[in-house]
Swiss-Prot record:
Superkingdom field: Eukaryota
Transmembrane segments: 11-27
Record-linked Pfam families: NADH_oxidored
InterPro entries in UniProt: NDUB1
Protein task: Accessory subunit of the mitochondrial membrane respiratory chain NADH dehydrogenase (Complex I) that is believed not to be involved in catalysis. Complex I functions in the transfer of electrons from NADH to the respiratory chain. The immediate electron acceptor for the enzyme is believed to be ubiquinone.
Quaternary context: Complex I is composed of 45 different subunits.
Localisation per UniProt entry: Mitochondrion inner membrane
Family statement: Belongs to the complex I NDUFB1 subunit family.
Entry protein name: NADH dehydrogenase [ubiquinone] 1 beta subcomplex subunit 1
Assigned keywords, A-Z: Electron transport, Membrane, Mitochondrion, Mitochondrion inner membrane, Respiratory chain, Transmembrane, Transmembrane helix, Transport
Amino acid sequence: MVNLLQIVRDHWVHVLVPMGFVIGCYLDKKSDEQLTAFRNKSMLFKRELQPNEEVTWK
């Protein structure tokens, strides 16, 4: 039991840092989805595009 506790005490960083990265990527993706939904309703981007005109957001 002491060995398991020692391993957890020594290597907690190796678990929390990747978990933080994964959670950050997930939250970033959700934020992008919300901003995309707003962009499609925005008055700025509501106009029709000219022929051969690219979208202004990427």
